[in-house]
Amino acid sequence: MKNQKKLIILTGPSGVGKGTVIKEILGKDKNIWLSISATTREPREGEQEGENYYFLKQEKFKEMIEKNLFLEWAQFAGNYYGTPLSSVNEKITKGFTVLLEIEVEGAKQIKEKFPESLSIFLLPPDKAELERRIRNRGTEKEEAIKKRLLRASYEISASNQFDFELTNHNVDETAKRIIKLIQT
């Protein structure tokens, strides 16, 4: 893939506010395109096919893995997630900066394959705030929440493996800081 500096990786634990920060970034800079990931998980309320995710059956996802059609892929919380390669290449070729919102293992894969990409790890203000955000979604049962919190502790311990660590205290400020990092 040419022009790796146009590839931006945003990662962090579930509930840290990646999606909210990204909405703010996209509203401020029209030259940044958000890559749409594929997943085998069920859509959450309000999520649209092709807008939030490409929702795939597990068989289709595995077929795409076998054909090397993902930039990266990983299994998380019992579901598969991946970044379709074709759309990323197309947008970079057209001159866009491509922003990838992906989980930590996928982010590590991309950083290894594309070392010139910019990787940013988004941190919560603290663990209590992270738990509050996950619970306030109201979309998951207690067992799933506990899994996400356990996974978050592991992921946060890997935050120093990325180019930048940013704590998401304020969405607007975090978005501005990320745009500044992209532009430098």
From Swiss-Prot:
Do the record's keywords include Phosphoprotein? Answer: no
What do the Gene Ontology cellular component annotations say? cytosol
Q: Known EC number(s)?
A: 2.7.4.8
Name of protein: Guanylate kinase
Q: Which domain of life is it from?
A: Bacteria
Q: What is its main location?
A: cytoplasm
Q: Which reaction does it catalyse?
A: GMP + ATP = GDP + ADP
Q: Which residues bind ATP?
A: G12, P13, S14, G15, V16, G17, K18, G19
Species this chain originates from: Prochlorococcus marinus (strain MIT 9312)
InterPro entries reported for this sequence: GK/Ca_channel_bsu (IPR008145), Guanylate_kin-like_dom (IPR008144), Guanylate_kinase (IPR017665), Guanylate_kinase_CS (IPR020590), P-loop_NTPase (IPR027417)
Q: Which family does it belong to?
A: Belongs to the guanylate kinase family.
Q: Which SMART domains match?
A: GuKc
Check the record and name the PANTHER family matching this protein: GUANYLATE KINASE (PTHR23117:SF13), GUANYLATE KINASE-RELATED (PTHR23117)
Where does it localize? Answer: Cytoplasm
